[in-house]
Amino acid sequence: MIEILDQNRLEVFVNDVFWHTISKCKGVAFKGDLVSDLGLDSLEILDLASEFHFRFDMLSGEKEFYLLQYKTAELWKEYILKAANDPSKRFGFFTSGSSGKPKEILHDKHLLIQERDFWIDFTKAKGVVCLVPVRHIYGFIWGLLLGSRLKQAKFLGPNEWHKVSDVASENDVIVGHPVAWQQISAPFPHRFAISSTAPINRKLTEKLRSKNIKGINVYGSTETGAIAYQAWENEHFKLLPYWQKQGIKLNRAQKNYSI
């Protein structure tokens, strides 16, 4: 079986979801007995299991992975990893809820892998520095899927963004959003920067470019993944090669595209 998500990146994702779902455990590693070590009650365990069941499509198909029969975080992670690397299952995400209640979105893995492989070819990245939450599709694709493929990924929270110039290697892609870019003042020249989730100010991109930082804005959504990108020095967006415009509609090609 081809590895889609490796153990190291899985740990990052599981902890992110754990802290987001069980706020009292923020900063506590997901390990040990769920009750005696992590202090979870039955409702918290049910909430957390439901979250992982959805995000890894664990209860669908011929192979079901029902987490509530296991009492330790290690066994949960063992079966989450199996589901993550089962090509017949999907990855689940929640929309931001900006237009109402957050919606559940499930993506076939081969489509996310298609996007991962495009970005690796496009950026020529050797590693990733991720400044965005990995539970959202943007951070998941760039931080976890690219990171698992490249075997080189670093993850910085908001209180660590100032370290980016210290941890980024020359061939790393730095994945952020406008808020992160506004707060990063130290130069990190000759890196490739990615921005998404919201429009980025032109003056800010000009400032970053003056420090020899190349970058692009990525346009997309939880429902679609990335659709188009815009180089910081350009005015217009360019469709990713597997998106095809037909009239006023966009259709995604499954295969047979070239960069």
Regions found by a protein language model. Name each.
Residues 1-91:
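Phosphopantetheine-dependent thiolation modules in NRPS/PKS and related acyl-activating systems
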Residues 52, 95-98, 128, 140, ...:
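Conserved S/T- and glycine-rich ATP-binding loop of Class I adenylate-forming
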Residues 81-94, 124-127, 213:
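Conserved pre-ATP/AMP-binding loop-to-beta segment of ANL
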Residues 92-104, 222-223:
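Conserved adenylation A10 loop of the ANL superfamily
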Residues 106-117, 127-184, 216:
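AMP-binding/adenylate-forming
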Residues 185-235, 245:
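Gly/Ser/Thr-rich phosphate-binding loop
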Residues 239, 248-259:
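Conserved ATP/PPi-binding loop(s) of AMP-dependent carboxylate-activating enzymes
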